[in-house]
């Protein structure tokens, strides 16, 4: 039996998938079912609004929207849904994604979009996990274990560096 998707991962173009797949991978690490769609704010606005308005009916709880250039997709989706929307600025050849970042982060009052770094789809996926984990104790426990593993990795790298440094200066 297929589980209902909990997170929608959408992008303005299929070329954005090279960035947005990092969100999908992060969500898969926590076994969160997703749906993935290409929904363009400029080329298919009716479908975009339909997607946003009906996401709740499909049991979607969070939408991650990636877009480059003018990057209107996250904000327009946020205007049409009560769900949290996480915007991912997708870097393009021109301006390295700065235009996308500014477009997504500068939302008017009343239409919030949580925005991650340029190309930060993995963090968008992890933020979606945290949002879901705020009301799911089992998922929250998985997040705590994930954070513990991150901390252990940093401690191990520090220990390696201290050993290496000691060899260099004769400690």
Swiss-Prot record:
It catalyses: 5-carboxyamino-1-(5-phospho-D-ribosyl)imidazole + H(+) = 5-amino-1-(5-phospho-D-ribosyl)imidazole-4-carboxylate. Its EC number is 5.4.99.18. Substrate binds at residues 13, 16, 43. GO terms for molecular function: 5-(carboxyamino)imidazole ribonucleotide mutase activity. Keywords: Isomerase, Purine biosynthesis. It is an enzyme of class 5 (isomerase). Gene3D superfamilies: 3.40.50.1970. SMART domains: AIRC (SM01001). GO terms for biological process: 'de novo' IMP biosynthetic process. Pathway: Purine metabolism; IMP biosynthesis via de novo pathway; 5-amino-1-(5-phospho-D-ribosyl)imidazole-4-carboxylate from 5-amino-1-(5-phospho-D-ribosyl)imidazole (N5-CAIR route): step 2/2. Pfam families: AIRC (PF00731). The keyword Isomerase applies. Catalyzes the conversion of N5-carboxyaminoimidazole ribonucleotide (N5-CAIR) to 4-carboxy-5-aminoimidazole ribonucleotide (CAIR). PANTHER family: PHOSPHORIBOSYLAMINOIMIDAZOLE CARBOXYLASE, PHOSPHORIBOSYLAMINOIMIDAZOLE CARBOXYLASE CATALYTIC SUBUNIT. Belongs to the AIR carboxylase family. Class I subfamily. This is N5-carboxyaminoimidazole ribonucleotide mutase.
């Amino acid at each position: 039996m297929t589980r209902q998707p909990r997170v929608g991962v959408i992008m303005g173009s299929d070329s954005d998938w090279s960035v947005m797949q990092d969100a999908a991978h992060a969500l898969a690490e926590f076994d969160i079912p997703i749906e993935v769609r290409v929904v363009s704010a400029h080329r298919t606005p009716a479908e975009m609004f339909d997607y946003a308005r009906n996401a709740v009916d499909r049991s979607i709880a969070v939408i991650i929207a990636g877009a480059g250039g003018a990057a209107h997709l996250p904000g327009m989706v946020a205007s049409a849904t009560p769900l949290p929307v996480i915007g991912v600025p997708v870097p393009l050849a021109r301006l390295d994604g700065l235009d996308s970042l500014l477009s997504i982060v500068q939302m008017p009052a009343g239409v919030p979009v949580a925005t991650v770094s340029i190309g930060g789809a993995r963090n968008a996926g992890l933020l979606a996990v945290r949002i879901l984990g705020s009301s799911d104790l089992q998922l929250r426990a998985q997040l705590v274990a994930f954070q513990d593993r991150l901390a252990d990795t940093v401690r191990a790298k520090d220990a390696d560096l201290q050993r290496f440094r000691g060899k260099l200066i004769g400690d």
